Regions:
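Transmembrane alpha-helices
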Residues: 13, 65-81, 171-204
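Transmembrane-helix boundary motif in ABC transporter permease subunits
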Residues: 22-25, 70-106, 118
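Generic hydrophobic transmembrane alpha-helix motif, especially the helices
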Residues: 46, 50, 94-149, 153, ...
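Amphipathic cytosolic juxtamembrane alpha-helices at the membrane-cytosol interface
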Residues: 54-69, 89, 93-102, 155-156, ...
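Glycine-rich helix-loop "coupling/hinge" segments at transmembrane-helix boundaries
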Residues: 109, 122-123, 200-242
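Non-cytoplasmic
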Residues: 118, 127, 132, 136, ...
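C-terminal transmembrane helix and the adjacent membrane-cytosol boundary/short C-terminal tail
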Residues: 138, 184, 191-192, 233-279
Length: 279
């Protein structure tokens, strides 16, 4: 990895570090008022206080972990389901069941993410599980589409056709002809879904959904403190900047990593043992 690519990993890693280990860093209580509302930064409160007089630094340190956990769980579940359905649909795309599955997935993709979030949150008020479920339902259609097309392209290659003509089992063709080229695409797709899940979780916090107050949440912090922008903008700017840095940083990281990973996958598509079988 070049110095430029290494440097591009710093912002998302720093934000992830703040989100993951922030709650364990010694700081003031993130939920208890410690001073007056919207007090400016000082030696006692490095980022000042928010609308209720709570320490902004403490809430920033405590407010990212829920977003990361929700996004990670949603991405893992959605990616695994998308990988399974996409692989199956790509390898059996001519079958009626595969076509019906893809049509059903397309119908799910037509539902707005915010509508799904609102409906699920209404059924489970104050629950982070509703945010995770909405993220999963939103991510599955896109993952299935992308991975299905990738699998279909791999199945149509000459070496995959030769393996099928030779009588190789579906499991063998999946292992040797599909998975080596599918894994990089699946990882890149999972990264994109992670960013989308973070954004949806932040949106849920902004709308007051999911775990309720006084729990800290970067998205909720932006909404709660918007009225005090002219008095102390830090309670809004800091969490907003962290969300942007995380989304842009992960996107740039995926962009830098995609070239080398996909290149290696393309060169390593057919291993030495497979070349002998094809010949």
């Amino acid at each position: 990895m070049t110095a430029r690519r290494l440097l591009s990993t710093v912002p998302p890693l720093l934000v992830l570090a703040v989100a993951v280990i922030g709650p364990w860093i010694p700081a003031a209580s993130p939920t208890a008022p410690v001073a007056g509302p919207y007090e400016p930064w000082s030696g006692t409160h490095a980022l000042g206080t928010d609308v209720l007089g709570r320490d902004v630094l403490a809430r920033v340190l405590d407010g990212g972990r829920a977003l990361i956990v929700q996004a990670t769980v949603a991405t893992t579940i959605g990616s695994l389901i998308g990988l399974g359905l996409g692989t199956w649909a790509g390898m059996t795309r001519r079958h009626r069941a595969a076509r019906l599955t893809v049509r059903s997935v397309d119908a799910l993709a037509a539902l707005p993410a915010i509508l799904l979030l609102l409906v699920l949150a209404a059924g489970a008020p104050g629950s982070g599980a509703a945010v995770v479920a909405a993220s999963v339902l939103v991510s599955i259609p896109f993952s299935v589409r992308v991975l299905r097309e990738r699998v279909a392209a791999l199945v149509a290659t000459d070496y995959a056709r030769a393996a099928q003509a030779r009588g190789d089992t579906a499991v063998a063709r999946l292992r040797y002809d599909v998975l080596p080229g599918l894994v990089p695409t699946a990882l890149a797709e999972a990264g994109i879904r992670f960013v989308a899940s973070v954004q949806l979780a932040a949106t849920a916090g902004f709308l007051g959904l999911g775990a309720g107050a006084p729990a800290a949440n970067w998205g909720r912090m932006v909404q709660e403190n918007s009225s005090g922008l002219t008095t102390n903008p830090l309670p809004v700017l800091i969490p907003a900047m962290l969300l942007v840095a995380l989304a842009v940083g992960v996107t740039l990281l995926l962009d830098h990593l995609a070239g080398p990973v996909l290149g290696e996958a393309g060169r390593g598509h057919i291993g030495p043992d497979r070349i002998g079988q094809i010949g």
